C-alpha cells in the first residue's frame, strides 16, 4: 500500500458579522511581509492561473472569475469570507428547504447541508472529529489527482467517489467511512441539484472551519462531475524527498510556500497507517485543533507521543520552505497560516475545473469560525502525550472529538496501580 501525506495524516455577509476580527487581510499581509515570510510573488509563491481563467480575457470575467483570479495571482484580496445567511428575526434571508424560494437561491440548500455536516464534524469537546479530518483529506485526494501534464481530466471532479476504481487504490485506504457518509449526504440532497464534486469540496471547507481556529475559506459550487478515474501516482508519499514533493506540487501549480501552508492540515491529525503500532498518535500536541503547533513541534521538541512524518521534517529543513515554516510557527503565525492555507486550498479545490468563471460563491452557507479555543481536557491530553504505551480507548475518544478527562484519569490510574506506571 502506498501511503500518502494526506492519507496518513488526515486518516488519522459583512465584516460586522465577525466584530472580533480586528485584522484586515492587508494588515496581515503587511505584518507578514515585514517579518520576511510574506506573500510577495516570488519564485516560491503560487501565482499561476488555472482552468478557464488562464485563457479568458478580463473583459469576460464574472465577479466570481475576477475574485478567484485575484486570489490565484496573490493580489490583495482575502481568501476568507465573512458573508453569512441571517437565519433569525425579521432579517432572516434563508428560505425554507424545499420551497421555490430556496430553489431560486443556489446557495440556500448548501446552508442546510452545512448544518448537517457540522453536527457530524464537531465533537463534544469542541474539537473536530475524525469525520472532519477525513473530509479534508477527501477534498485533497479528489482535487490532487491532477497535474499540468495529465491532460484534460482529473482534479476536483468527484471521481474519487463516482469512479469506483479510485477507492480501490491503496493511497485512498482509510477513506471508506467518509466516502460512505458523503454518499449518504449526496443521496439525501441530489434531488436539489447538487453535484458530488461540489459536495466533496464544500465538506472539506465546512470541516476546516468547524475545527477550532480554522479559516472560513471562500467556497464555490458549480463544478462538473466525472466518473472517469483520475491518473495514478499524483498524491504525495510520506517518504518522499523535499525535491520530489516540491516538484510534484509545482506540477499542480502549487509552489513551495503553498505546499508549506497545505501540509499544515496535519495539525489536526492522528496518524494510523505510517506506523500501525502507534495508531492514534497525533502530529502535534493539540489534535483536532487547527492551530500552528504542528509547525513549531515539527521544527523543535515535542511530547513523546507526537508523531512526525519524515517528509514533513525534510520539508521543514529545505531552503525553499524553511523560512515560511518558521514564520507560521512564530508570532502572528496563526493569521498568516490561515490566510495562506485558505488561498492555497482555493487553488487546490479548483484544479481541473474549467468553468471557474461560471461558479457561484456560496461562502455564506458555511458555519461561523471559532476565533479562540481552549480544550476543556488539555491537561488530560498533556498527560497522555507524555506516555508512549498505546491505549486505544483514549486515541479513539480523541478521534471522535470527545472529552478524555475522566477516561484518561481512570486508565492511567489503573496502569499506575497495576504496574507502578509513572505519569
Task: Set out the residue ranges of the language-model regions.
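Cleavable N-terminal signal peptides of Sec/SRP-targeted secreted and luminal proteins
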Residues: 1-17
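Catalytic cores of secreted/periplasmic or lumenal enzymes
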Residues: 18-423
Amino acid at each position: 500500500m502506498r501511503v500518502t501525506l494526506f492519507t496518513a495524516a488526515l486518516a488519522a455577509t459583512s465584516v460586522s458579522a465577525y466584530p472580533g476580527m480586528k485584522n484586515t487581510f492587508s494588515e496581515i499581509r503587511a505584518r507578514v511581509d515585514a517579518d520576511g515570510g510574506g506573500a510577495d510573488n516570488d519564485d516560491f509563491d503560487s501565482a499561476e492561473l488555472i482552468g478557464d481563467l488562464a485563457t479568458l480575457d478580463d473583459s469576460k470575467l464574472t465577479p466570481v472569475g475576477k475574485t478567484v483570479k485575484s486570489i490565484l495571482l496573490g493580489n490583495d484580496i482575502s481568501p476568507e469570507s465573512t458573508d453569512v445567511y441571517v437565519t433569525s428575526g425579521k432579517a432572516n434571508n434563508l428560505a425554507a428547504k424545499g420551497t421555490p424560494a430556496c430553489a431560486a437561491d443556489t446557495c440556500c440548500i448548501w446552508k442546510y447541508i452545512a448544518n448537517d455536516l457540522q453536527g457530524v464534524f464537531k465533537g463534544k469537546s469542541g474539537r473536530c472529529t475524525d469525520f472532519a479530518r477525513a473530509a479534508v483529506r477527501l477534498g485533497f485526494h479528489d482535487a490532487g489527482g491532477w497535474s499540468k501534464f495529465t491532460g484534460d481530466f482529473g482534479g476536483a471532479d468527484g471521481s474519487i467517489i463516482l469512479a469506483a476504481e479510485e477507492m480501490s487504490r491503496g493511497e485512498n485506504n482509510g477513506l471508506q467511512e467518509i466516502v460512505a457518509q458523503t454518499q449518504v449526504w449526496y443521496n439525501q440532497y441530489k434531488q436539489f441539484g447538487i453535484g458530488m464534486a461540489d459536495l466533496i469540496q464544500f465538506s472539506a471547507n465546512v470541516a476546516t472551519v468547524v475545527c477550532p481556529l480554522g479559516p472560513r475559506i471562500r467556497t464555490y459550487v458549480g463544478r462538473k462531475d466525472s466518473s472517469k478515474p483520475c491518473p495514478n501516482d499524483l498524491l504525495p508519499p510520506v517518504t518522499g524527498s523535499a525535491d520530489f514533493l516540491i516538484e510534484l506540487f509545482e506540477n499542480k501549480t502549487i509552489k513551495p510556500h503553498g505546499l508549506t501552508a497545505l501540509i499544515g492540515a496535519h495539525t489536526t491529525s492522528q496518524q494510523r497507517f505510517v506506523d500501525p503500532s502507534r495508531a492514534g498518535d497525533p502530529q502535534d500536541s493539540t489534535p483536532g485543533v487547527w492551530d500552528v503547533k504542528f509547525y513549531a513541534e515539527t521544527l523543535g521538541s515535542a511530547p513523546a507521543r507526537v508523531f512526525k512524518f519524515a517528509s514533513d521534517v525534510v520539508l521543514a529543513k529545505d531552503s525553499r520552505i524553511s523560512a515560511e515554516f518558521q514564520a507560521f510557527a512564530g508570532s502572528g503565525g496563526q493569521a498568516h497560516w490561515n490566510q495562506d492555507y485558505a488561498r492555497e486550498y482555493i487553488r487546490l479545490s479548483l484544479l481541473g475545473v474549467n468553468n471557474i468563471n461560471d461558479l457561484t460563491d456560496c461562502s455564506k452557507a458555511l458555519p461561523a469560525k471559532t476565533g479562540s479555543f481552549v480544550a476543556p481536557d488539555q491537561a488530560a491530553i498533556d498527560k497522555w502525550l507524555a506516555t508512549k504505551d498505546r491505549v486505544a480507548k483514549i486515541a479513539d475518544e480523541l478521534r471522535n472529538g470527545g472529552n478524555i478527562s475522566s477516561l484518561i484519569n481512570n486508565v492511567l490510574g489503573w496502569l499506575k496501580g497495576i504496574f507502578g506506571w509513572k505519569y
